[in-house]
Every structure is written in C-alpha cells, then in structure tokens.
Amino acid sequence: MKKLEKVTPETARAVFAHYFSKKLQKLQQLHGGATNFVFEASVGKEDLILRISNRPTKLQYFMKEQWAVRAAHAKNVPTPEILEVGNDIIAMPYMVMRRVEGEPATARSIGLDIYRQMGAHAAAINSVATSDFGHIFDWSRNRLSRSHSWKDYLADNFKATERVQALARHKILRPENLKKLKVAVRKLPGLKAQPTLNHGDLRLKNVMLDGKGKISAIIDWEHATSNWAPCWEFAIALHDLGIDEKEAFLDGYGIAPKEFEKISNTIKVLNILHYGPIIEKAAKDKDRAALARFEQRLNGALDPFSL
C-alpha cells in the first residue's frame, strides 16, 4: 500500500498562501484523523475553513459536495459557502470554505421547531432533480460508473442482497423477520423510484444553529447522493429521533401521516439494510456486545409504540 502523504500546518499554509495575498492572522488545526484534516484560519476579515485529505479519491467527494451545496442553496437551504475545491496546489484533495457562524445543534437542548426546520430543509433538498442513482450523478461527467436505474443501483452499488446475507449469516434477525426482509428486498427493485438530491445524513450532528432558534447551515455533505426521496433520506434522518422529534420532522417536511404510512415499510427495510456493513465489522472484530445490541434493535424490542 502506498504511504499516505503527511499533512501539517505548513501544508495548510501553502494552500492559503496561494489563494490569499493577505497574511494569515491565525492558523490552527481543529481536528485530524488518519486521512482527513481540518484547519481554521483568519485572512483579513475572512474566517475560513480548510479541509485536506491525503487520500486521492477524496477529490470526487469534495467535488460532489461543492455541487450539492450550490444546488441546495439555490433552493434556499442554508449551507456552507465552498470557495474552492482542488488538488493542484499540494497534490492532495482540499476544500476551502467560509466558516459557518453559529454552534452545533448537538451543543444544547433544542425544541421541536428545529426538527420542523430540518424537515422543511430536507423537502427543499429533495426537490432538486438529479439523474441516475448513487454517488456518481450530475456533478460528474463520468458515464461508465453510473447506475441508471433503481434496480441497477440496488444490485451493483448498494448490494442489497449481500446486506441481507450478512444479517442472515450472523443470525441478527429472528427467522420470521428475516423471511419478511427477504420478501421485501425482492420487491424493492420493482418499486417506482425517481432520483433526486439527498443529503444522505441529515441528522442533528450536521446542523448548525444561529443562537436565535434558526438553522444557520446544513453541513457535511459527504454522503450526498442521487436517490429515491423521501425514502432514502428518511431512513437515515429519522434513525436517531424520538417519536415527538420524528413527528415534528415529518410535519416540517410536509408529508401527511397517511402518505408516510404508505412508505414506512420501505423506510424500515432500507434502514435495516444500512446495518449490513456495520454488522460485518462487528462480527470481524468479534464484538459480541455490539451484535447483541443490533439483534435487540433490529427485531423491534426497543419499539414501545406498536405490537
């Protein structure tokens, strides 16, 4: 495996020096992992954020984020302002953006109106028409790597069948529930799905607040996808929410209870399938406690609202 390039404050300084003639007033690294690094800087009156990855494939994701953010902003969704995406200055993918004002929604207790706002923004995002399904869509000029149909996406990209096999192999679902899932997954390719833009991870951790009870930005568009809305969006967005928060989100989205009921089973199926790779990792790590929690969760033991 090729050794990854080292990312330091000097790496970030080189990017800022190329695009801004004014001297940096401050430069600090906010956080960094094995492959993703985030820096904050002040240049004149500008407060900026620089994201750098030492994985070359990340350039595609940065380009996708840039397209998705602009498309969503055109629908009046509050988003970060991405100024530049490239890999020519430091031979690594980077993204320069203006710093978002506000605080993370996870930093304080919030009311139901924030969830209504999230739902309304989700509806606006999902109103952006796109072509094809998955990670490669309108932002890219590529043609050979596209999934042109929902059926192709499920088989070749999402790999729904393999996810079911993972659940079966590790005996996560009770036999009767596994049987129901297999029947539902066989029906998925035949459902009428039209692609639109999805944020892909519209949860509280990706929401910034302005301190006045309003959302100032929807952030972290790495998982943006051209997919079937609202089913795909809801499968993740509703995952962490309590019943009151779910109802507020759906109210903000503008979907009536009867309409939601029609798609609720599909949302459940997608949600369960999302666990496939996570379960495989837990099994590989021999994390029996995690597998027991998944078994409890996915068989409905934690659902206090239905029989």
PLM-predicted stretches and their roles:
Residues 3-23, 127-200, 210, 290, ...:
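An alpha-helical support segment within catalytic cores of ATP-dependent transferases
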Residues 26-149:
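ATP-binding pocket architecture of kinase catalytic cores
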Residues 45, 92, 193-195, 214:
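Conserved catalytic motifs of the protein kinase core domain
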Residues 51-52, 83-84, 138, 197-200, ...:
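Short beta-strand segments
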Residues 66-67, 113-114, 214, 233-237, ...:
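Glycine-rich, phosphate-binding/catalytic loops in enzymes
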Residues 195-197, 203-262:
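Active-site Asp-x-Gly
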Residues 231-258, 271-288, 295-301:
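Active-site activation/catalytic loop segments of kinase-like enzymes and analogous catalytic loops
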Residues 262-270:
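Alpha-helical scaffolds flanking conserved acidic
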